[in-house]
Amino acid sequence: MGSTCVRIAIDAMGGDHAPNEIVAGAVRASEELGVKVLLVGDPQQIASALPPKTNLERVEIVPAEEAIAMDEEPLNAVRRKRKASINVAMDLVKREQADAIFSAGHSGAAMASALLRLGRLPGVDRPAIGTVFPTIKAGKPVLILDVGANVDCRPKFLEQFAVIGSIYSQYVLGTGEPPKVGLLNIGEEDTKGNELALRTHQLLKDNPNINFIGNAEGRDVLSGEFDVIVCDGFVGNILLKFAEAIGGVILQILREELPQGLHGQIGTAILKPNLTRIKQRMDHAEHGGALLLGVSGVCLIGHGSSQAPSVFNAIRMAKEAVDNQVMQQLQSQYEILHSASD
């Protein structure tokens, strides 16, 4: 992108803390990251949420008449509410008035809107939500997909997730060539798992474009032995939310187990830098969002409970994706691999 200002469309009405926290994180990103944020939603609510002295050169309010609630059926809502904030924001990307989009609202609605407006990459049947997990090996994250876009999957969907994930891991996360791919399963043996796992295992094993090293059990997810792990969105979403919770549990236990009184205060002061680093490695707010991989546009999906720090980090991820030409890399590499397999 060079010196061009990256433009991020923000679904300001999506999420549990919208629009206040969404706007706060977006404005901070405009100030610290040099991006232009297009806040899509109710103009009055967004304007009321803007901090004093906001630089309006990098912040623009784009009106949207409606919003999609978390309890609505996503596809019907996206089709019925054409002027919903997620649709208006997605249209900005489609018309190339924005370079990327972020939403902390209904993830199903975000995916449906992306599919209807941006379309899929050639050869991709279903996009997947991919999120990066920290591992016990510092600086060696693992990409997990799908973590919620598709609760029911066919074996070929998981095979495509593995290909897309491998490209993203290699060209964006900078892992070694080729990335090591695992299939989330209940055992290491080839014969373990349900029908989906067994059939997917064979597809991954037979695909020359995937460096499949075998099944990954739950205990292997954070081991650092895998660069990419694929699963259906039902299992992946449970895994994601468990991982988000366990970080907070560990930190709470550490705080409770530190001695009380003067010795405890001294110990806490000594350990504070370590605890901060642990929190940064484990807190989902540090990562901000997950990419919707497989659609023809940079689309970041945030947690429904996202607050300003998460929004800021999601926008940072979106900017990095645009700067690193993630879509161009995914499209060109996937087309090469897809053509070779035909």
UniProtKB/Swiss-Prot annotation:
- Where is it localised? Cytoplasm
- Please state the Enzyme Commission number of this protein: 2.3.1.274
Q: Name one GO molecular function term.
A: phosphate:acyl-[acyl carrier protein] acyltransferase activity
**Which is a Pfam family this sequence falls into?**
FA_synthesis
Q: Which SUPFAM superfamilies match?
A: Isocitrate/Isopropylmalate dehydrogenase-like
- Catalysed reactions listed for this entry: a fatty acyl-[ACP] + phosphate = an acyl phosphate + holo-[ACP]
Heme recorded as keyword: no
| Pathway entry | Lipid metabolism; phospholipid metabolism
EC class (word): transferase
Superkingdom of this entry's organism? Bacteria
Gene Ontology cellular-component terms for this entry are:
cytoplasm
Family annotation (PANTHER family): FATTY ACID/PHOSPHOLIPID SYNTHESIS PROTEIN PLSX, PHOSPHATE ACYLTRANSFERASE
Listed name of the protein = Phosphate acyltransferase
Q: Which organism is it from?
A: Trichormus variabilis (strain ATCC 29413 / PCC 7937)
